[in-house]
Amino acid sequence: MENLHKRILEEGQALSNDVLKVDSFLNHQVDADLMYEMGTYFKNYFKDHNITKIFTIESSGIAPTVMTAMQMNLPMVILKKQGSKILKGDVYQTTVHSFTKGTDYELTLQKKYINEDDNILIIDDFLANGEAALGAARLVEGAGAKVAGIGIVIEKSFQPGPKLLEEKGYDVYSLARIEKLEKGIIKIKK
């Protein structure tokens, strides 16, 4: 996805060998046109996967997921990271370690938003160690549903997540694959 690659190279900041800051268009200020284009790419790739719902994890995956759900005319579910008085009782939960924040959180899904017949597309902003995507997949599979695919905006190909998801047999489609990060240097796989 050439527009995304261009934005990463022009506006992204490699803060270290494993941290890429893209807050000018993805996770602080959001470029709606770019999100719409991402939705088109995800729709085109996953259109024959018999998807029934699209899941994302709050919060940075929401914008590209909304655009994908709109274009595929499918419901979208936001998996919650924060505890809430509203999310009690009939829920699925799993513990996930956040690479970015260095902490664990409980990923939560209300049972009423999934059933055994669902084929779920999971979309997230980053794939690093694979913890978030695997946590979402655990919730889906724990409900007896199927993970139809995983859409990633930016994959850090040099970290363990991509290989881990591949070994588990998931169909992963990444819009940008970062080959290498060094302070001030970003290299994208073509």
Curated annotation (Swiss-Prot):
EC number per UniProt: 2.4.2.22
Main enzyme class: transferase
Q: Predominant location of this chain?
A: cytoplasm
Q: Does the keyword Nucleotide-binding apply?
A: no
- Please provide the record's keywords in A-Z order: Cytoplasm, Glycosyltransferase, Purine salvage, Transferase
Q: Which CDD domains match?
A: PRTases_typeI
> Matching SUPFAM superfamilies, A to Z?
PRTase-like (SSF53271)
The reaction(s) catalysed by this protein are:
XMP + diphosphate = xanthine + 5-phospho-alpha-D-ribose 1-diphosphate
The Gene Ontology CC terms held by the record are: cytoplasm
* One of the protein's GO biological processes: purine ribonucleoside salvage
Hey, which pathway is this one from? Purine metabolism; XMP biosynthesis via salvage pathway; XMP from xanthine: step 1/1
Enumerate the subcellular locations listed in this protein's record, separating them with semicolons: Cytoplasm
Residues bound to 5-phospho-alpha-D-ribose 1-diphosphate = A128, N129, G130, E131, A132
Could you say which residues bind xanthine here?
A: L20, N27, K156
Q: Name one Pfam family in it.
A: Pribosyltran
Presence of the UniProt keyword Membrane in the record = no
Annotated Gene Ontology MF terms?
Answer: xanthine phosphoribosyltransferase activity
* Oligomer and partners: Homodimer.
* PANTHER family given in the database record: HYPOXANTHINE/GUANINE PHOSPHORIBOSYLTRANSFERASE (PTHR43864), XANTHINE PHOSPHORIBOSYLTRANSFERASE (PTHR43864:SF1)
* Entry similarity comment: Belongs to the purine/pyrimidine phosphoribosyltransferase family. Xpt subfamily.
The record's HAMAP family line, in alphabetical order, gives: XPRTase (MF_01184)
- Biological function: Converts the preformed base xanthine, a product of nucleic acid breakdown, to xanthosine 5'-monophosphate (XMP), so it can be reused for RNA or DNA synthesis.
This one is known as Xanthine phosphoribosyltransferase
Protein species of origin: Clostridium botulinum (strain Eklund 17B / Type B)
